[in-house]
Amino acid sequence: MAPARAGCCPLLLLLLGLWVAQIPVSAKPKDMTSSQWFKTQHVQPSPEACYLAMSNISKYIEWCKDLNTFLHEPFSSVATTCQTPNIACKNGHKNCHQSSGPMSLTMCELTSGKYPNCRYKEKHLNAPYIVARDPPQQGDPGYPLVPVHLDKVV
């Protein structure tokens, strides 16, 4: 009797689950390595206004990203962070590293709009950050380890 009471709901839930699974968790462009995409999304040595900086990201993913943080230092400095002692990431993996001190950052938070007209408020701060790292892939700079994910602003 239980299956009869369930009706179409299990099928609907299955179809909904399959549809949601098609949405990419990481909208990394196919022609970029994880490190190159990290650099595009998060490394900005010279601060830019959020609306301008985020439009560069939106053109790849074709939607308005809810929140993004830019690190105002060269990629080489962020890559050096990958040489600090390992710490646990938010997901429990042990491939994260914290910056040696506070760094200049800009956080861009979506306030309204639909792609391509995304509107953001920006918050400037100095804070340490935590990045996840991996070995470089073909096409990445020649560092022993490269940042691939901004895990947290501390």
Curated annotation (Swiss-Prot):
<dbReference type="InterPro" id="IPR036816">
    <property type="entry name" value="RNaseA-like_dom_sf"/>
</dbReference>
<dbReference type="GO" id="GO:0003676">
    <property type="term" value="F:nucleic acid binding"/>
</dbReference>
<feature type="disulfide bond">
    <location>
        <begin position="64"/>
        <end position="118"/>
    </location>
</feature>
<keyword id="KW-0732">Signal</keyword>
<feature type="active site" description="Proton acceptor">
    <location>
        <position position="42"/>
    </location>
</feature>
<comment type="similarity">
    <text>Belongs to the pancreatic ribonuclease family.</text>
</comment>
<feature type="disulfide bond">
    <location>
        <begin position="89"/>
        <end position="96"/>
    </location>
</feature>
<keyword id="KW-1015">Disulfide bond</keyword>
<feature type="active site" description="Proton donor">
    <location>
        <position position="149"/>
    </location>
</feature>
<dbReference type="GO" id="GO:0050832">
    <property type="term" value="P:defense response to fungus"/>
</dbReference>
<protein>
    <recommendedName>
        <fullName>Ribonuclease 8</fullName>
        <ecNumber>3.1.27.-</ecNumber>
    </recommendedName>
</protein>
<comment type="function">
    <text>Has a low ribonuclease activity.</text>
</comment>
<dbReference type="GO" id="GO:0045087">
    <property type="term" value="P:innate immune response"/>
</dbReference>
<dbReference type="GO" id="GO:0050830">
    <property type="term" value="P:defense response to Gram-positive bacterium"/>
</dbReference>
<feature type="binding site">
    <location>
        <position position="90"/>
    </location>
    <ligand>
        <name>substrate</name>
    </ligand>
</feature>
<dbReference type="GO" id="GO:0004540">
    <property type="term" value="F:RNA nuclease activity"/>
</dbReference>
<dbReference type="InterPro" id="IPR001427">
    <property type="entry name" value="RNaseA"/>
</dbReference>
<dbReference type="InterPro" id="IPR023412">
    <property type="entry name" value="RNaseA_domain"/>
</dbReference>
<feature type="binding site">
    <location>
        <begin position="65"/>
        <end position="69"/>
    </location>
    <ligand>
        <name>substrate</name>
    </ligand>
</feature>
<dbReference type="GO" id="GO:0004519">
    <property type="term" value="F:endonuclease activity"/>
</dbReference>
<feature type="signal peptide">
    <location>
        <begin position="1"/>
        <end position="27"/>
    </location>
</feature>
<dbReference type="InterPro" id="IPR023411">
    <property type="entry name" value="RNaseA_AS"/>
</dbReference>
<keyword id="KW-0255">Endonuclease</keyword>
<keyword id="KW-0378">Hydrolase</keyword>
<dbReference type="Pfam" id="PF00074">
    <property type="entry name" value="RnaseA"/>
</dbReference>
<dbReference type="GO" id="GO:0005615">
    <property type="term" value="C:extracellular space"/>
</dbReference>
<dbReference type="GO" id="GO:0050829">
    <property type="term" value="P:defense response to Gram-negative bacterium"/>
</dbReference>
<keyword id="KW-0964">Secreted</keyword>
<keyword id="KW-0540">Nuclease</keyword>
